[in-house]
Amino acid sequence: MAKYLGPKLKLSRREGTDLFLKSGLRSIESKCKLEQPPGQHGIRKPRLSDYAIQLREKQKVRRLYGVLERQFKIYYKLAASLKGNTGANLLQLLESRLDNVVYRMGFGCTRSESRQLINHKSIMVNNKVVNIASYQVSPNDQISIRNKSKNQSRIKAALELVEQREKPIWLEVNSTKMEGIFKRFPERSDLSAEINEYLIVELYSK
């Protein structure tokens, strides 16, 4: 599957917000000017149309979760087919991706690193190895690190970092055993207010 291999900070500057693509707890605001677009002096921002604003929001969310365009559109169509609010459904689908759950539980410092752990068969779901990053986790599923992978330094480093981070209330994590439970899908109020999913719904509704 294709993936972005360029500078990660450049993506965050382009979207004007920290996409948490780099490991560590300190916001990258101290490393780069998020309100200034990429380039030595940045580019003067033109007044954006409604379409451009909607497109930018979609790109921001897509990059935040590390999902390609085609796959993101599939998620949207699935979200629209489900009962309830389409925008909230979309966020729940993205949040229940295995790579995101592994990241939220603190087994990987970033979503990208979490995908690597999955690809290298270091992650188990209900005691079975799963190596598909887009695997949809269901409520009460158990996520754990394989025994032979528990001594990896990057996993230990990630678990040390997560102790200083706010823990999602829809997850239950035992850092000592390197396992956790996906208790439920997150409510919209549980997630970042910086995401405006309504703009994405408006974009795809045209």
Swiss-Prot record:
This is Small ribosomal subunit protein uS4. PANTHER family: 30S 40S RIBOSOMAL PROTEIN (PTHR11831), SMALL RIBOSOMAL SUBUNIT PROTEIN US4M (PTHR11831:SF4). One of its GO terms (cellular component) is small ribosomal subunit. It comes from the Bacteria. Part of the 30S ribosomal subunit. Contacts protein S5. The interaction surface between S4 and S5 is involved in control of translational fidelity. Residues 96-156 form the S4 RNA-binding domain. One of the primary rRNA binding proteins, it binds directly to 16S rRNA where it nucleates assembly of the body of the 30S subunit.
